[in-house]
């Protein structure tokens, strides 16, 4: 079994990356393969050229970022975890770019992610967690994924790198 996680933070060692490292340890301890993609700040937006949709290629014509690698890994994975920091009440711009392209190339129409298991978590300082969480869930819902929930929302609080790891309740939910 394999889970692919997409880290929507442009910060390499930010709270989202640190929380995903804890998740990695838990998942791998259970014998499940876990791969994290962090596209960083250099992600191009979808151009709505529909090449991926019209050709069924499952690839984006834009090839100078890692989105095609993410698309391929998500198609092969058994589960997908979308993880994002809250940026001004929603997902970060680079995460939006990744999800737009993933959804068009592998979701809508060709629906390679149909019935894949998906989960979401977000890191935040204070507010915007529910809105961000709903954006991530909405993307998975639109791709007809099976969404895993918990007894609490997937939010871990912390502003500066490392603070999220101190949110005991949030970390318990994430792990």
Please report, for each region that a protein language model flagged, where it lies by residue:
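N-terminal beta1-alpha1-beta2 submodule of the flavodoxin-like/Rossmannoid cofactor-binding fold
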Residues: 1-108, 158-175
């Amino acid at each position: 079994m394999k889970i692919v996680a997409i880290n929507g933070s442009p910060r390499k060692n930010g709270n989202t990356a640190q929380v995903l490292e804890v998740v990695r340890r838990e998942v791998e301890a259970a014998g499940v393969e876990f791969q994290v993609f962090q596209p960083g700040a250099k992600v191009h937006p979808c151009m709505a050229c529909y090449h991926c949709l019209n050709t069924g290629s499952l690839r984006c014509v834009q090839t100078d970022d890692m989105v095609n690698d993410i698309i391929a890994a998500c198609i092969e994975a058994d589960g997908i975890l979308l993880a994002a920091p809250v940026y001004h009440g929603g997902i970060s711009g680079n995460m939006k770019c990744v999800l737009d392209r993933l959804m068009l190339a592998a979701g809508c129409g060709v629906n390679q992610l149909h019935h894949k298991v998906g989960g979401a978590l977000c890191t935040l300082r204070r507010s915007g967690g529910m809105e961000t969480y709903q954006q991530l869930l909405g993307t998975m819902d639109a791709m007809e994924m099976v969404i895993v929930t918990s007894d609490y929302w997937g939010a871990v609080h912390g502003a500066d790198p490392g603070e999220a790891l101190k949110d005991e309740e949030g970390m318990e939910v994430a792990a």
